[in-house]
Regions:
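Charged C-terminal transducer/switch regions of large nucleotide-driven machines
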Residues: 1-99, 103-106, 346-490, 494, ...
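N-terminal accessory nucleic-acid engagement/regulatory domains that precede
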Residues: 1-236
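Conserved helicase NTPase catalytic core signature
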Residues: 197-243, 450-573
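N-terminal pre-P-loop "Q-motif" helix
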Residues: 244-265, 549-550
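Conserved RecA-like ASCE P-loop NTPase motor core of nucleic-acid helicases/translocases
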Residues: 267-286, 296-316, 548
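Short secondary-structure boundary/capping segments
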Residues: 285-290, 319-325, 561-566
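Conserved helix-turn-beta segment of the N-terminal RecA-like "Helicase ATP-binding" lobe
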Residues: 312-342
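SF2 helicase catalytic motif II
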Residues: 568-585
């Protein structure tokens, strides 16, 4: 594997972490204490940095950054061609105690001072330079992070700065009134997880096929646009997440290319807003869930939808909300969750606990949040009773446990899958039979389809289900669905009926699988080891089929404890990764 790109991406991320801060525009406290050691800010000044509405408890520590020196604007003939505001090339992280006293950070990685990247050579021609990147990297690698005495730590930071730049803090400051700026520390640490992952990948001697496919320079073979018969008679299209509208032509063409056996493991979908990319992604997820239940039912997939963009994540979370019963609207038992307290198909992996009332959330790898509340064997009988009541009411059955329910569901699902194949064959024969007979394929067609019912009989049987017919009648009010060719009309009918049914049957199968796995798990002996943690993720995936996270947060969730390593990456644990707004990643 060519690792040059990995090194480049890592360095770009490191540079972004060391970007310049516009401290003149931020809430700050300015200390003008000459050559004295900064040891505190006044207690009354703390709200200037941490407004009262956003403060933690009064007895909690807070993270701050201190700028001990300033790069002043340079003027010539009364004007400057460069930055005309002060800039701060060096930042020291610290802890602010409740009384305003400064303390060395508890986390050793936060004790390493930050040289802002734009001031280190090589840099842009119009940026000023304080030191070289190579020299700074060497000095930082030798910096002592064990020191906890504030006075000695501050002295070590100044020595580091002087070794790199040849200047003291006092010499790079206002001549008459030197100042030290204190600001709230930015939210940090997310990028560190990604940087750690880069380091492990750069050291790894194992094969990582998907990553190798992404970074190799060889151009992929372009797939041809599929023929109409392949588009509308797609025999691997088994599921739809929505039963209200069928796929559009472009969505159906894209799905045909995606499910083509020769398709790459990395599949890009482009299109302006409003062209149906989200609906297509929902179809991919629905299809994957159904295929998994029917083809390897004992191994639930881990599906992740991710993005670098917070707004995109919010949109994804909304897309996986399950419609709840409301006044005046009849309850559709099929499309409700058959486990208590669930109104979504998506689990949000994020540490933002202020959003816990909006979404089902997992805050960390310990499972704080929804997992620890829900993934609880003590609630097993509650789940089993709730599920069986919904299951037996919907199917008019009398199943006694989740395993019986799964057998019942999978039998029905296989029958529906076969029915989809029959419908496509019948529509294909009706539309293309004469054309193929003219080409001499009649005898083979007759042998293949001699046991098939007629197209008219298939449609008649299909319309016996009042719900299907009602949805179809609403659709054909629109001219685009009237008088369609047989295969296109059949594709529309299947989207709003059998494919939609299969998706929800698969969801309810996975709910039963969650109950079965919860009954068998040993929560007391469960660890964060590779096997236990992967098993827990799969169990959660039975309840929440889609995990949703930003790319900044995701790496910290996909780690386990392995051979004494507390953050060993779970390589290849994700079965399907969907990247929204991928151009921003």
């Amino acid at each position: 594997m060519d690792k040059k790109l990995l090194k480049y991406w890592k360095n770009c991320l490191l540079d972004a972490e060391r970007r310049s801060r516009s401290l003149t525009k931020e809430a700050r406290v300015t200390l003008r204490i000459g050559d004295k050691l900064p040891e505190f800010i006044l207690r009354k000044d703390i709200p200037l940095i941490f407004p009262k509405g956003k403060q933690k408890e009064n007895d909690e520590k807070r993270k701050i950054q201190i700028a001990p020196c300033v790069f002043l604007p340079e003027y010539e003939n009364g004007w400057t061609s460069r930055q005309n505001a002060p800039e701060y090339p060096f930042l020291i992280s610290a802890t602010l105690l409740p009384d305003g006293t400064f303390q060395v950070c508890d986390n050793k990685s936060e004790r390493i001072p930050v040289f802002v990247r734009k001031f280190l050579s090589p840099n842009a021609r119009n940026d000023r330079t304080v030191a070289s990147l190579s020299n700074v990297d060497r000095l930082l690698s030798e910096f002592d992070t064990e020191e906890t005495d504030w006075k000695k730590y501050w002295s070590a930071c100044e020595t580091l700065f002087q070794d790199a730049t040849g200047l003291t803090f006092r010499e790079m400051n206002y001549a008459d009134k030197p100042e030290i700026i204190v600001v709230k520390a930015p939210g940090r640490g997310m990028a560190q997880k990604i940087i750690n992952l880069y380091d492990k990948l750069l050291e790894s001697k194992s094969s990582h096929p998907l990553l190798e496919l992404l970074i190799r320079k060889k151009q992929e073979t372009l797939l041809p646009v599929p023929e109409k018969q392949q588009v509308y008679c797609n025999r691997t299209h088994w599921a739809q997440m929505s039963g209200e509208f069928p796929l559009s032509v472009s969505q159906r063409e894209t799905l045909a290319m995606y499910t083509e056996p020769g398709s790459s493991d990395i599949f890009a979908v482009n299109g302006p807003p409003g062209t149906g990319k989200t609906t297509f992604l929902q179809t991919v997820i629905a299809n994957r869930i159904v295929h998994t239940v029917l083809e390897h039912p004992d191994d639930p997939d881990i599906i992740v939808a991710s993005s670098a963009n917070n707004q995109a994540i919010t949109n994804i979370l909304k897309d996986f909300k399950v419609e709840q019963p409301s006044d005046g609207k009849p309850v559709n038992l099929l499309t409700l969750r058959w486990l208590p307290g669930l109104d979504t198909l998506g689990l949000y992996l994020s540490g933002k606990d202020e959003q816990k009332d909006q979404y089902k959330m997992m805050f960390n790898t310990k499972g704080d949040g929804f997992p620890n509340d829900y993934d609880d064997p003590a609630r097993l009988e509650e789940y089993r009773g709730f599920y069986l009541e919904h299951f037996n009411r919907f199917f008019q059955a009398s199943c006694q446990n989740e395993v019986e329910c799964q057998r019942f569901l999978r039998k029905k699902m296989k029958k529906i899958r076969d029915e989809i194949g029959t419908c496509l064959n019948v529509a294909s024969l009706k539309q293309y039979g004469k054309e193929m007979a003219d080409k001499g394929f009649l005898s083979r067609l007759l042998r293949k389809f001699q046991k098939l019912p007629s197209y008219e009989a298939i449609i008649s049987d299909w319309e016996q289900t009042a719900d299907f017919k009602e949805r179809y009648d609403k659709l054909i009010v629109n001219s685009e669905y009237k008088s369609l060719p047989y295969t296109e009309d059949m594709a529309v009918r299947l989207d709003i009926s059998y494919r939609y049914l299969l998706f929800w049957y698969a969801i309810h199968d996975r709910e039963a699988e969650f109950i079965r796995r919860l009954a068998e798990c040993d929560k007391e002996g469960e660890t964060r080891g590779r096997e236990d943690y992967t098993e827990r993720l799969k169990r959660l995936a039975c309840v929440m089929p889609v995990f949703i996270s930003t790319f900044h947060s995701l790496p910290k969730y996909m780690v386990c404890v392995d051979n004494g390593e507390w953050d060993a990456p779970l390589y290849d644990a994700i079965d399907l990764l969907i990247v929204d707004e991928s151009g921003q990643v």
